[in-house]
């Protein structure tokens, strides 16, 4: 085992674990700040016509951001950028970046202007019920026109971030999303009284947040010599390759968003509160899946792309294997702990005021169901870049479509007996299916060969997770009822339980001969 990891780190690659820690910590900070933002917005604006209008107005730019900026573009752009960096030289890479940024700016400027002009019709499609209330409809239209430029700004910020990631500057793009939260918190606390109606402050905060995310990264882009003026050339082969890859990439990312929308439609037919219970459970799920899964995918895509571009298949396999082992090392205990601690988590974080014990219990059910698929959600973030880095987007797209169909079949099977928890379970099981099919294709196409030692590695993990689970159940047994005490007291108790579980897990690993330094070996 030690020889294997020595080979991994005796390369010219940077210490990926250090990069993972940096990206994960930045993502964690952004998620925590996001929770604070939600709490502040809820406290200042409450829940009513104005906030309904804002969330609808923000939903479309946010959806397009998820589809375009954070998923499809990176999948299409990063592997080709890595190829240019590896084979074409700095000047050719600068020209390539200029042409891609020019086409991106042109396309998104058209989309932004069209969206602002067509705002009333967009609202008619996305929130037809608002048309019955003239004031609400007018406010939503106004808010949408203010927030729509965010699509252009965040997409350009994502372009800059993708370039920085390819140059191994991972922490800078990872920190950028915090500026949106900071902007919204600042505008909500200090600027809202100066707007009429006050909710307009939130819309402007979104656009300002987009500007900050872009501007923050530009000095770092200049440092690596890639700050260029956008240029338009419809005949450049490199830029056109990115455009051609964008089609299937957008389809692939859209499939997951479509699945979430369909699940919301299913939930809307269930008891009142079902959508909210799933939302809060999903927010808890996003911590491990976002912090670990997104961070791993972020650092692996450019690293794998470089290995593929240089023709180093052995290094490519070692990187994939390293990512998968780290995935299982952290995701397996996270999934088990999330299921065991579902009640303490939901009660400690949410059961206050109008959020009743019944609401917490229903959220708990959804969270347990989600936890079944946590490892699948995270493993997909490691396996999918294995295809994207080879400029093969079609295979993951085909698998995503199969997964979407299976998700809906499972929804129909589970929604009757399990209600909203059945919908959560469908998402979790579908993620595991997605991961399994991706792995099968990687092996079938002889893209990835696992390194030796997996059986003993998994045995140690399973034994350690069982020890952790026993400790968690033991500590929970002696804890008083979680609904007792203030929020601070509940969170302190929850923290103590989590620390006990973490200590038990890594202590068991140490007894079984596992050494964390196997993952952190560096070049000299």
Swiss-Prot record:
The molecule here is called Probable lipid II flippase MurJ
Q: State the function annotated in the UniProt record.
A: Involved in peptidoglycan biosynthesis. Transports lipid-linked peptidoglycan precursors from the inner to the outer leaflet of the cytoplasmic membrane.
A GO term, aspect molecular function: lipid-linked peptidoglycan transporter activity
- Main location group: membrane
Looking up PANTHER family in the UniProt record yields: LIPID II FLIPPASE MURJ
Keywords attached to this Swiss-Prot or TrEMBL record, sorted alphabetically, are:
Cell inner membrane, Cell membrane, Cell shape, Cell wall biogenesis/degradation, Membrane, Peptidoglycan synthesis, Transmembrane, Transmembrane helix, Transport
Instruction: Classify the protein's membrane topology as the record does.
Output: Multi-pass membrane protein
Q: Which InterPro entries match?
A: Lipid_II_flippase_MurJ/MviN (IPR051050), MurJ (IPR004268)
Pathway of action = Cell wall biogenesis; peptidoglycan biosynthesis
The Swiss-Prot or TrEMBL record describes its family as follows: Belongs to the MurJ/MviN family.
Q: Which GO terms describe its cellular component?
A: plasma membrane
* Cell compartment(s), UniProt: Cell inner membrane
Q: Where are the transmembrane segments?
A: 44-64, 103-123, 146-166, 172-192, 195-215, 250-270, 284-304, 322-342, 367-387, 396-416, 420-440, 456-476, 494-514
Q: Which GO terms describe its biological process?
A: cell wall organization; lipid translocation; lipid-linked peptidoglycan transport; peptidoglycan biosynthetic process; regulation of cell shape
Superkingdom of this protein's organism: Bacteria
